[in-house]
C-alpha cells in the first residue's frame, strides 16, 4: 500500500441511506482480522476492467467471497475499485473502494 492509502466500503444504513466507511489498511486488520481468521475468507476475482494513463491505473474488479476455497456458493459478490500509482519501480495501491451486491443493486452483466 502507498503511504496514506485508504480502504472504503459503501454500506447501507437501516434508514436506507448509503454512506462510505473509510479505513486504513491497519484499521481494517484491527476491525476485521479476528473475524476473518475465525470464519475464513477467500475472495476470487471473476471479471476485471482496467484502464491506465502514465503512472496511474484504475481496475474495476468483480469478486466472489467465500469462507473457504471449497465452498461451492459465495456468501457475497461485489465490485472492488482499485486505484494504483507506479513510482517508476513498482505499483502501489492508493485506494480500494468497494460495494457488495444487493437485491436492489445487482451487478450488471457487463461486469460478470
Question: At which residue positions do the language-model features occur?
Answer:
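Short beta-strand segments enriched in hydrophobic/aromatic residues
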Residues: 1, 63-65, 97-100
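Non-catalytic cap/lid and distal C-terminal segments of serine-dependent acyl enzymes
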Residues: 2, 6, 27-30, 76, ...
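Residues that flank catalytic or metal-binding motifs in active/ligand-binding sites
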Residues: 3, 46, 78-80
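Structural motif
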Residues: 4-5, 56, 81, 90
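Surface-exposed, charged secondary-structure patches
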Residues: 6-7, 11, 19-71
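A short acidic/glycine-rich loop-to-helix N-cap element
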Residues: 70-74, 103-109
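Short beta-strand edge/turn micro-motifs at domain boundaries
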Residues: 77-104
